[in-house]
A protein has these predicted regions:
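N-terminal cap/lid segment of alpha/beta-hydrolase-fold proteins
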Residues: 1-22
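Short substrate-entry loop that stabilizes the transition state in hydrolases
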Residues: 20-24, 29-63, 68-78, 333-336, ...
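Accessory cap/linker subdomain of secreted extracellular hydrolases
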Residues: 39, 46, 50-54, 62, ...
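Alpha/beta-hydrolase fold nucleophile elbow
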Residues: 134-148
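Glycine-rich nucleophile elbow surrounding the catalytic serine of serine-hydrolase chemistry
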Residues: 145-155, 334
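Short alpha-helix in the alpha/beta-hydrolase fold that links the catalytic acid
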Residues: 322, 336-346
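Short beta-strand/loop motif that positions the catalytic acidic residue
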Residues: 326-328
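C-terminal, loop-rich substrate-recognition/catalytic regions characterized by aromatic stacking residues
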Residues: 373-612
Length: 612
């Protein structure tokens, strides 16, 4: 069907099963990047038994929902990829690329969930669906999707918060969206693809001074309510960005052309990627981005990310608070839990009764294991949340919940813990004081075999089929072209739950505008086998964001992980962690003189513990 601008979209509608009533909710299920409309379609309730279990077209139709699935603008439809998916045909149109779908230049190109393009596509097609099926309840609409669809689900919630009607087109029914269920989503795409490690959220600086955030659970490209302005451009996730670009060019067509200051204008993704690949420096003195990176900051923050949308404050003031159930993965190295945590924190700061819940587990993109039992438990919780709010979002106390990551055996519903905020999942702190000093030149870490072995794309999942948990590639814990420190054995079992950080005093050599500090956290068993627990990165920008000396905190992606008694904690620090992150350009990168190195980790237990 033609979208709001005439671009063809490949659309399927699954009708509710007989005997499910006379008035029906509508749910839109949005596919991931490089996928198509078939992703959430199923001929059974069980589907894949995990992510799609009781969360697919068959399940919702059996419970009285209309289900709208369509192939996003710019992507081909190559047909069903799993035996449980129905053989719905691909849509075809004269301007679309074979074999069908929604890759239909010049307008039907990938826009990476632009708020004025794909977001409007969904609203338009939902309106067409409600027009075609009058028994759809126009006040009972939900949106859900994973990854690419998760990022859009958040943007759709922002759109509803900012307007009385979610879908409001001349000649089409007006619709209200009550619930969004983003799954392994982004909320700040600029930060998710290029994390800078700087705190976000509320500013700790006086009015008129440069922005400085205060909260590692809200780390972001910039301050909410801006176009991502406040923190420096971060470190590119090279393996993921390269893989996603290849996937997009294989399964679709990216938008290109001369960039526009308007969000609905052309977006030159290939040129932007080329500038990111060229690396630092990204900004000039006084915190001014170079012209191309300024485009990247504005587009990927303000146009493609829910965190920066003005609709949240508008909705707060108008009493419109769509219900949101956001699902993220501790071991998801593409869109870590921070993507849900920052929005939980922000929305609760606007309205403590905003109906937003977050659930985190060993799920999502690689390195995640995605255990079926955890997914089934999470989907049951998501279903109950959806049913409770589809007739109208219900403000009140909501929580953040976490399922532990395990190497052998799956966590169960009984293993989940909950708290009133992401930080409150932990009750105590484990501090590991190494008291070491080390010089890290720009090339430090380049020869470390664990860089490739631990990468989410090159290294695979956290486990392998032959040998339990993925382990360190090193034969010893000795440093390899970087810094490695190992703690004393833990006297008692300790459970990490939260983000945590590596910390050090630093001094950077003068005359260069940037530096990088990448960190990895390992669990070392008594036999010397080390298992990756988490990683993180911080980019120094000495053009006005960072001082030449001070104390740096490198936030980890986080985990819910138990260190048994007798195990030791290992910290790796380096400037190069390739291919996970783009290595810094040596000519413009400072050498870092580190001292007083330590780990600071949030613990589930209430006691504070310090070891060496």
């Amino acid at each position: 069907v033609p979208s709001f601008d005439g671009s063809p979209l490949d659309v399927d509608v699954t009708r509710p099963m007989p005997g499910t009533g006379n008035s029906h909710p509508l749910i839109v299920l949005l596919h991931g990047f490089g996928n198509d409309k078939h992703e959430w379609e199923s001929i059974t309730d069980a589907a894949d038994g995990a992510d799609k279990y009781h969360w697919n077209s068959h399940w919702f139709a059996a419970h009285g929902y209309y289900v709208l699935t369509y192939t996003a603008r710019g992507f081909r439809d190559t047909g069903p990829r799993a035996s449980y998916q129905p053989a719905t045909p691909a849509g075809v149109a004269p301007t679309c690329l074979p074999p069908g779908g929604s890759a239909c230049p010049p307008t039907g190109t990938i826009r990476v969930k632009n708020k004025d393009v794909e977001i409007r596509d969904t609203q338009w097609v939902a309106g067409l669906t409600a027009l075609a099926y009058p028994d759809i309840n126009r006040d009972q609409v939900a949106v859900s999707g994973g990854s690419y669809g998760g990022g859009e689900s958040w943007l759709q919630a922002a759109a509803q918060a900012g307007s009385e009607y979610w879908s409001d087109w001349p000649g089409l029914p007006r619709l209200r969206m009550q619930v969004a269920v983003p799954r392994y989503p982004w909320t700040d795409l600029a930060y998710a693809l290029m994390p800078n490690g700087h705190p976000g959220g509320a500013s700790r600086t006086p009015a008129g001074q440069p922005y400085q955030g205060t909260d590692l659970y809200s780390s972001a490209q910039g301050a909410p309510g801006t176009l991502g302005v406040g923190n420096p451009i971060g470190v590119a996730k090279s393996s993921y960005i390269g893989g996603l670009y290849s996937l997009g060019t294989a399964n679709g067509v990216f938008d290109e052309g001369t960039p526009s200051p308007q969000s609905n204008g052309p977006e030159p993704f290939t040129a932007w990627l080329g500038r990111v690949d060229a690396g630092e420096p990204y900004s000039t003195p006084d915190r001014v981005d170079d012209p191309t990176m300024a485009q990247v900051r504005t587009a990927f923050s303000g146009w493609h990310s829910a965190y920066y949308q003005p609709g949240w404050r508008v909705g707060r003031d108008a009493g419109r608070t769509p219900a949101i159930f956001s699902i993220s993965g501790w071991t998801d190295d593409l869109f870590p839990p921070l993507e849900s945590f920052r929005m939980f924190t922000y929305l609760k700061s606007l309205d403590r009764d905003w109906p937003i819940a977050v659930v985190v587990g060993d799920i999502g993109h690689a390195r995640a294991q995605n255990p079926p039992g955890v997914w089934q438990a999470i989907n049951q919780r998501a279903w109950l949340f959806l049913q409770a709010n589809i007739t109208g979002s219900r403000p009140g106390r909501t929580t953040v919940s976490s399922y532990p990551t395990r190497c052998t055996g799956s966590a169960t519903a009984a293993d989940a813990i909950s708290a009133d905020s992401p930080a409150d999942l932990a009750k105590g702190t484990l501090t590991v004081d190494f008291h070491d000093s080390v010089l890290l030149p720009p090339s430090s870490g380049a020869a470390d075999p664990d860089a490739a072995a631990s990468d989410a794309v090159a290294g695979g999942t956290i486990t392998s089929t032959s040998a339990g948990c993925r382990t360190s590639a090193r034969l010893t814990t000795a440093p390899v072209d970087g810094y490695t420190a190992v703690s004393q054995p833990l006297p008692t079992e300790q459970t990490l739950v939260g983000i945590g950080h590596a910390q050090a005093r630093y001094a950077a050599t003068p005359g260069t505008p940037t530096a990088v500090l990448a960190a990895r956290l390992w669990d070392v068993a008594p036999d010397g086998v080390a298992v990756l627990v988490s990683r993180g990165v911080y980019r120094f920008d000495f053009t006005g964001y960072d001082a030449r000396s001070g104390v740096v905190q490198v936030p980890f992606y986080g985990n819910h992980w138990t260190f048994p008694a007798g195990h030791r904690l290992r910290l790796d620090l380096a400037q190069v962690d390739q291919p996970t992150y783009r290595p810094p350009n040596p000519a413009v990168t400072a050498t870092l003189d580190l001292s007083a190195t330590r780990l600071v980790l949030p613990l589930r237990s209430a006691a504070d513990t310090t070891i060496r």
